[in-house]
């Protein structure tokens, strides 16, 4: 799929991976609806110009997600792509000093990372399926964001790893099911990236994390995630796969 003049919805777009992805799509000639729970998404969209619009929405809420998809259709007239970057992290042991892992905290992480991702996927797929196919029969592409924690989950990451493993596991069956509509589904599983989630860490901790990456020995850059998202969109043979973007990092147990 060519990006030029196509319409994309990017979640988690106020900062980090989502913001970089939205910027990259705009630079490639796309039109982007930026979605985030943070009100800053509106200012972010304004920075990107007339082909961008920001909408505040909770992706795990059915009505809010429907409004976001509707906003893309109303603003730009179609929907050709979804990049799900919205997500949260959290650390809690299955059995810690204060007792077992809280169910509310587990539900929150799974609710946003997995259910929120699926919520946007199903609603975007509905909109894409109603659109006209291109010359190759393609109607849309959906890119979800998992994490290497889906495969190398560490101690204290039970909820986060489970949520991201769910996103990874969703990829192939969704791709197979949506193939009849000409809609592709892919997932990127990033390693450790320079995002606002890392901002609270000391320089010493950041350097230690970077040293654990075989090559390049540094943290990933959001624009590198955005570049892979763009390639996935443009390469129609990429479908039903999870791509690790991690510099060959394999996380230890703790």
Regions found by a protein language model. Name each.
Residues 56-68, 103:
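The beta1-alpha1 cofactor-binding region of Rossmann-like NAD(H)/NADP(H)-dependent oxidoreductases
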Residues 88, 99-119, 143, 167:
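Catalytic Tyr-X3-Lys loop
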Residues 147:
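Residue(s) in the substrate-gating loop at a strand-loop-helix junction
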Residues 221-245, 250:
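C-terminal substrate-recognition "lid" of short-chain dehydrogenase/reductases
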């Amino acid at each position: 799929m060519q990006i030029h003049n196509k319409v994309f919805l990017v979640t988690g777009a106020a900062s980090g991976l989502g913001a970089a992805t939205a910027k990259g799509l705009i630079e490639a000639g796309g039109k982007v609806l930026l979605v985030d729970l943070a009100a800053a998404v509106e200012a972010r969209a304004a920075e990107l110009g007339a082909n961008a619009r920001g909408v505040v929405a909770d992706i795990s809420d059915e009505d809010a997600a429907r409004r976001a998809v509707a906003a893309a259709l109303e603003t730009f007239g179609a929907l050709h792509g979804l990049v799900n970057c919205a997500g949260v992290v959290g650390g809690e042991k299955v059995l810690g000093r204060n007792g077992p892992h809280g169910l509310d905290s587990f539900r929150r992480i799974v609710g946003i990372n997995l259910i929120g991702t699926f919520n946007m996927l199903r609603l975007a797929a509905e909109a894409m399926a109603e659109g006209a196919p291109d010359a190759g029969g393609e109607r849309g592409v959906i890119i979800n964001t998992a994490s290497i924690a889906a495969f190398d989950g560490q101690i204290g990451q039970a909820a986060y790893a489970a949520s991201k493993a769910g996103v990874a596991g969703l990829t192939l069956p969704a791709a197979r099911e949506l193939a009849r509509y000409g809609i592709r589904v892919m997932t990127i599983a990033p390693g450790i990236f320079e995002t606002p989630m890392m901002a609270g860490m000391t320089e010493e901790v950041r350097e230690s994390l970077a040293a654990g990456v075989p090559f390049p020995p540094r943290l990933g850059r959001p624009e590198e995630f955005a570049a892979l998202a763009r390639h996935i969109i443009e390469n129609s043979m990429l479908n039903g796969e999870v791509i690790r973007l991690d510099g060959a990092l394999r996380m230890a147990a703790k």
